[in-house]
A protein has these predicted regions:
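Zinc-dependent deaminase
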Residues: 1-19, 80-83, 87-147
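Active-site phosphate/pyrophosphate-handling residues
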Residues: 4, 33, 55
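Small-residue (primarily alanine) positions within well-ordered alpha-helices
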Residues: 9, 13-16, 26, 52, ...
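Residues that line or immediately flank small-molecule/substrate-binding pockets and catalytic motifs
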Residues: 42, 76, 100
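Helix-adjacent hinge/juxtasegments
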Residues: 49-50, 54-87, 91
């Protein structure tokens, strides 16, 4: 199941690039169905907070009741950055599944921004289940082609 949903996130990441944005996509999953999807919109919306996970959490928080969020899983093409980790925490989404590890992307970009999700949530005392990487090489191909 994880593979299929991560592949959908990779399709969203490719769509984000086609729309002129950065290669990231995310979806919300519960009870065997995709509740909603989001892409990165940083470039087209001129908004540095327009990460796929933030866009997803922002929309989900407005449209779904808290009980739905509490029982959902967030799938994302790449491990969430620290900003997105915080949004997921505050939305009370208990599970994250990611494709590409943040450390792999940071290494590709030569960046030092990476904070592991598991480490962040442990420091917060949050019981958010983190699974990943899943199909990482497929996701890295998207990033290599972009960055």
């Amino acid at each position: 199941m994880h593979d299929e949903l991560i592949k959908r996130c990779y399709a969203l990441a490719r769509s984000a690039v086609a729309h002129g944005n950065h290669p990231f996509g995310a979806l919300l999953w519960k009870d065997g169905q995709i509740l909603m999807e989001a892409e990165n919109t940083v470039v087209t919306q001129l908004d540095v907070t327009g990460h796929a996970e933030i866009n997803l959490v922002r929309t989900a928080s407005k449209r779904l009741d808290p009980e739905t969020l509490i029982g959902a899983s967030l799938y994302t093409s790449t491990e969430p950055c620290i900003m997105c980790q915080g949004a997921i925490y505050w939305a009370a989404i208990p599970r994250i599944v990611y494709g590409v590890a943040g450390s792999s992307l940071a290494e590709l970009q030569g960046a030092a921004w990476y904070t592991p999700s598991r480490e962040s949530y442990q420091r917060m005392g949050a019981s958010i289940e983190v699974t990943g990487p899943v199909l990482e090489e497929e996701g890295m191909e998207i990033h290599r082609g972009f960055w």
